[in-house]
Amino acid sequence: MLNVHEAPNGFRWRIVPERNDSCVLEEGMVQSDEPGVYLEGEYGIRHENETVVRKGEKNEYGQFMYLETITFVPIDLDGVDPDVLTQYERKWLNEYHQAVYDKVSPYLNDEEKAWLKHATRAI
């Protein structure tokens, strides 16, 4: 059985030697991206997407890689305060939601499309 947290690759805010997940990312590796916030003793919220490592720019500093999203699920806008987003963050969210709608809606019936259209509305 596969798990999104299998070695050898992983991102953490600190190194955990026993996890053995500090490796060089290689093209084709799948990596979960799980931004979140946790309020101690209260609750936590996390949004998770799966990404695949792709080759990006190569220059005098070496080969750069980037993460391409491969799962497309709306971010719940009920949990987003647009007033605290920067222009860049708002643009990113709107573009991400447009990609979600464009990629997923062809597989949905009219009722499901209407739900997805609302869930991915621009802010």
Indicate residue ranges for each PLM-predicted region:
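Charged, cofactor-coupling segments
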Residues: 2-123
